[in-house]
Amino acid sequence: MSTAVAHEPPYDVYPAAEPPYYRVRYAASKEPGELIFPVNYTIWIPPGIKQLRGVIVHQHGCGEGSCKSGLTGAYDLHWQALAKKHDCALLAPSYEQPEKADCQMWCDPRNGSGAAFEKCLGDLAAKAGHPELAKVPWALWGHSGGGHWAGGMVLLHPDRVAAAWLRSGVPLLKADPAKTGIKAHTLPESALKVPVMCNLGTKEGVTVKDDRFAGVWPANEALFGEVRAQGGLIGVAVDPLSSHDCGNQRYFAVVWLDACLSIRLPNVSGESLKEMPTEGAYLAEPTGSEAVPAEKFTGDAQKAAWLPNQLRATRRQVATPARQFREPIPNSMNRLIEVAST
């Protein structure tokens, strides 16, 4: 894989990457097993930071429109606020997938995107003067194919992933005869310790069964059921207003990741991730609206959605604008923004 110079529309227009932003771009590879699309990685390093503790990855979905959005992902102020609070970098890939091309060729990290991602961390570490970037933990957010990618990275690299938010896309754990182009993953025991949130719109098969994206819920349900049955730290949050768009899910995603990173990131860069404590967790019915302390949950805990703390994953909260959120969402977001402005 080599650094690329030429760009093809619509991937030829994007913001400049001057410090604290840095960028690398790799050409498509013709080697078996390597990434067949060009890819552009942009990273933001919080100004003045001496030692990074992690990297937050904002991963787009499939198709030209979504892939193109990755060109500006590292410039998002909400995500920068989260990154700054935890001494993390913010990384946004942009896979230059043609509109009709097979998304699996990048959203399955085994098809070369996983290796390209790890390579970019080393190259960006050198550019930014932060050698620790190549080894710090990852916090992953992904939409659609990006959720498939983020979930795949949890299964392939559980010891590197602090937490993962999967919006409208998840990897398969069992082969699906109806989706022969998608390869199943295996579920290692170590992945059960990684906090994961499955987040989707209700129109993606939860209450609306004839939507174009109605197959999203069965896939999420299958992943959730298998992981939770084995004691995995996985939850479900359903947005009652959206379909395959992202809606207002960031208002919960950022706060959920904040909770996970506050617990899991090592105090000193280079040390191992901390395990999530068993005490303090909350449980909820997967498509329900309220969560309760785990010890007060009266249903089957192995079928219940898991939350790291008292964050209430109500379906109403995920969909409602920030000014109407009940506690603790608005104060948490406000604190993050205050951190970013200092």
Language-model segments: which ranges?
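A domain-start/cap signature at the N-terminus of enzymes
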Residues: 4-55, 85-86, 138-159, 181, ...
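Active-site-proximal beta-strand/loop segments in catalytic clefts of secreted hydrolases
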Residues: 46, 58-62, 93-96, 141-145, ...
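Loop/turn elements at helix/coil->beta-strand transitions in domains of secreted/extracellular proteins
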Residues: 51-55, 85-91, 134-137, 158-163, ...
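Short, solvent-exposed loop/turn and secondary-structure capping segments
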Residues: 67-72, 101-106, 151-153, 175-179, ...
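Alpha/beta-hydrolase active-site loop
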Residues: 105-132
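The feature captures the conserved acid-bearing segment of alpha/beta-hydrolase catalytic domains
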Residues: 162-251
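Alpha/beta-hydrolase-fold serine-hydrolase catalytic core, especially in secreted/extracellular enzymes
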Residues: 230-232, 239-341
